[in-house]
């Protein structure tokens, strides 16, 4: 049975999976303890994780990742739908990704619209971030009205 849970304790147990969504531990540490961590579980097994920070009139999806063997089954979309309700007091849900990422289509299919760039964002990482054979520099931002 699938259920959503807020994860309030022992976040360190989820770091290996979160690192699949954001491969730089230093970057992950910037938001790991200040955001809300949610899991979609199948009984006791985590299927999808998402970490969201909320400031002002926006909630920002800092990390979303589905366990590899469960990818492509709609669990990420279920999580986005859940988060849209959970953070509906905020005006928007924001998400960022690389410029050539397949995640762009994922966000667009889930009602997000292109909203801007964070210039030079990926240059802050301790190593070059390569996606589909290209080095990333800017983060592409998406936004969805939820409130």
Q: Which residue stretches match the model-derived regions?
A:
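Conserved acetyl-CoA pyrophosphate-binding loop and the N-cap/start of the following alpha-helix
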Residues: 70-82
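Short hydrophobic/aromatic beta-strand or adjacent loop that forms the aromatic wall/cage
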Residues: 35, 136-142
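Conserved GNAT acetyl-CoA-binding A-motif
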Residues: 86-99
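Conserved N-terminal entry element of GNAT/NAT acetyltransferase domains
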Residues: 1-10, 140, 147
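Conserved active-site alpha-helix within GNAT-family acetyltransferase domains
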Residues: 77, 99-131
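Acetyl-CoA-dependent GNAT
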Residues: 5-68, 80
């Amino acid at each position: 049975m699938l259920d959503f849970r807020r994860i309030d304790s022992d976040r360190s147990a989820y770091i290996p999976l979160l690192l699949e969504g954001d491969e730089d531990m230093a970057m992950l540490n910037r938001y790991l303890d200040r955001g809300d961590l949610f899991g979609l579980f199948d009984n006791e097994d985590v299927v999808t994780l998402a970490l969201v920070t909320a400031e002002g009139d926006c909630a920002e999806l800092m990390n979303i990742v589905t366990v590899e063997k469960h990818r492509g089954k709609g669990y990420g979309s279920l999580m986005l739908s859940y988060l849209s309700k959970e953070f509906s007091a905020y005006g928007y849900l924001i998400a960022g990704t690389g410029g050539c990422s397949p995640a762009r289509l994922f966000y667009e299919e889930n009602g997000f619209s292109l909203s801007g760039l964070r210039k030079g964002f990926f240059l802050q990482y301790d190593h070059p971030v390569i996606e589909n054979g290209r080095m990333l520099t800017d983060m592409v931002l998406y936004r969805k009205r939820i409130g």
